[in-house]
């Protein structure tokens, strides 16, 4: 399945099969016909009221109106910026300062934040869609125009707006539709906030292939009793998730192919897929295809992927991050020089996946983006190596610490801890003293055990861990928790854990 234009591919379903379901809520099912009608109306309103090319903000949660605004903005030649409702006020203010949007579609009530942008309330948005004024033909979208802007965290505390073009998105969607078992009309679970680019992995492959999205409300995601009561009734076929969230799901004994028999495809992105998690999924969902993918926001969601099978798990000690998509090249570099095949270095991505850089931030763009072999390239900050065309992840460069002179990859310890029989899930963070790493602290979700005292459990974990890592990699302190904290994007909240251990 190959598409030539994102907007036309989505609109085709609205014209060909207007009654086909596109967005399935608990009490309402929206159709492709409604999506086309509403997005056309929004595009017409934008064309009439603001100059082409200026970004617009779409503020809300997982709602149909968000989709209509995304598509309407794109049709009219505007990049959209998704901001999740309840985002901290200070972060919203910083995004507005950087982005200078012309208009804000407030699908949820807009907070008391001053802005020069015109604010379109949900009531006014509904009126725009209901009136559906006849507009002139829309100017065709150019592939280099920006499709969306997603703001990621910046090292200085100011968010960076990653600009993804129509061409970037088209390349990604065609790859997912071709390589990951997606067929026409599949039903996707919509879980990730639209302000997180993981959502792009379900949103656009679903819409361009005539599929449907079933949004999962936050209150359901955070209430596992409700989630696992509801899940078998939804007939979900494709689930895009972070490994951390899936780890929590796998704690539920009934989360398997027998009780949730509709699932056909799992897609993972956003962080490393632990081998223990992958093994559980292979064992529990023999009927499903499981894919591990890799890529930063700056390279349009993901650029490499591999199907996770028992044979793959038997061959590799760590789940590979896959083979690189055809229109993209990965270089392994140290100090901007390519290393020998099989050596570890920084993963540098070049080609069709690489974004246009950071919005209104030439300094940060110049630091991370450059031209290499005639192609746009991006320094990921991830360590890895290429072996026989397979990309192997070796952790974040900025998750590497030095303790007593040894360079330690924290995610490597996480990986080995997750393989200890007493451990369900773990995250290791450094504790600092006078700007130097004093010790390693492990936060652990433990499996059921017979130890009466925590120190005996810790002793047993250390003994088993010592069989696979060097002594200097064994955490000095263990903190036992019922659940590791997650960010809004579903990743382990390492910053929060670091703040906790370094607050005392």
Predicted features along the sequence, with ranges:
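AMP-binding/adenylate-forming domain of the ANL superfamily
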Residues: 1-149, 164, 275-278, 326-329, ...
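Conserved AMP-binding A3 loop
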Residues: 31-33, 147-174
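AMP-dependent adenylate-forming
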Residues: 5-7, 104-139, 169, 289-292, ...
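Gly/Ser/Thr-rich phosphate-binding loop
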Residues: 209-211, 236-240, 250-316
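Conserved AMP-binding
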Residues: 60-63, 84, 182, 192-196, ...
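Conserved pre-ATP/AMP-binding loop-to-beta segment of ANL
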Residues: 135-151, 158, 182-188, 194
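ATP-dependent adenylate-forming carboxylate-activation enzymes
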Residues: 41, 60-64, 78-97, 108-110, ...
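Conserved AMP-binding/adenylation subdomain of ANL enzymes
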Residues: 160-189, 197-237
């Amino acid at each position: 399945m190959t598409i030539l234009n994102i907007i036309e591919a989505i609109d085709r379903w609205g014209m060909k099969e207007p009654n086909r379901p596109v967005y399935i809520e608990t009490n309402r099912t929206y159709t492709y016909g409604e999506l086309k009608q509403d997005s056309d109306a929004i595009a017409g309103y934008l064309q009439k009221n603001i100059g082409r090319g200026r970004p617009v903000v779409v503020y809300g949660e997982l709602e149909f109106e968000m989709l209509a605004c995304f598509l309407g903005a794109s049709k009219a030649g505007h990049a959209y910026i998704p901001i999740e409702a309840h985002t901290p006020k200070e972060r919203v203010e910083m995004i507005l300062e950087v982005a200078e949007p012309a208009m804000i579609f407030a699908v949820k009530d807009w907070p008391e934040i001053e802005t020069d942008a015109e604010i379109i309330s949900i009531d006014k948005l509904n009126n725009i869609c209901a009136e559906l004024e006849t507009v002139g033909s829309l100017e065709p979208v150019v592939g280099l125009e920006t499709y969306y802007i997603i703001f990621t965290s910046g090292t200085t505390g100011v968010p960076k707006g990653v600009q993804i073009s129509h061409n970037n998105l088209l390349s990604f969607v065609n790859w997912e539709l071709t390589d990951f078992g997606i067929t026409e009309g599949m039903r996707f679970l919509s879980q990730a906030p639209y302000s997180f680019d993981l959502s792009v992995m379900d949103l656009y492959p679903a819409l361009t292939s005539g599929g449907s999205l079933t949004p999962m409300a936050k209150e359901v995601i955070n209430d596992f009793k409700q989630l696992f009561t509801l899940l078998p009734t939804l007939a979900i076929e494709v689930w895009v998730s972070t490994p951390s969230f899936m780890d929590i799901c796998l704690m539920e004994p009934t989360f398997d192919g027998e009780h949730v028999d509709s699932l056909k495809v799992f897609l993972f992105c956003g962080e490393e897929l632990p081998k223990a998690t992958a093994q559980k999924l292979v064992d529990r969902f023999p009927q499903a295809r499981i894919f591990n993918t890799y890529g930063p926001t700056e390279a349009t969601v993901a650029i490499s992927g591999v199907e996770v099978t028992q044979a793959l798990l038997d061959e590799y000690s760590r789940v590979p991050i896959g083979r690189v998509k055809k229109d993209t090249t990965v270089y392994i570099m140290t100090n901007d020089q390519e290393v020998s095949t099989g050596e570890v270095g920084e993963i540098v991505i070049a080609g069709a996946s690489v974004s246009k850089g950071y919005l209104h931030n030439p300094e940060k763009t110049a630091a991370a983006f450059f031209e290499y072999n005639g192609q746009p390239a991006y320094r990921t900050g991830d360590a890895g190596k290429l072996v026989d065309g397979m990309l192997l992840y070796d952790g974040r460069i900025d998750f590497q610490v030095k303790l007593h002179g040894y360079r330690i990859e924290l995610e490597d310890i996480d990986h080995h801890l997750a393989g200890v029989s007493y451990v369900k899930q773990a995250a290791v963070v450094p504790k600092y003293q006078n700007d130097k790493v004093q010790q390693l602290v492990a936060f652990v979700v433990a499996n059921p055990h017979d130890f009466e005292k925590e120190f005996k459990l810790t002793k047993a974990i250390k003994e088993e861990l010592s069989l696979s890592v060097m002594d200097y990699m064994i955490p000095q302190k263990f903190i036992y928790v019922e659940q590791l904290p997650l960010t809004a994007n579903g990743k382990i909240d390492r910053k929060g854990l670091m703040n906790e251990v370094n607050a005392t």
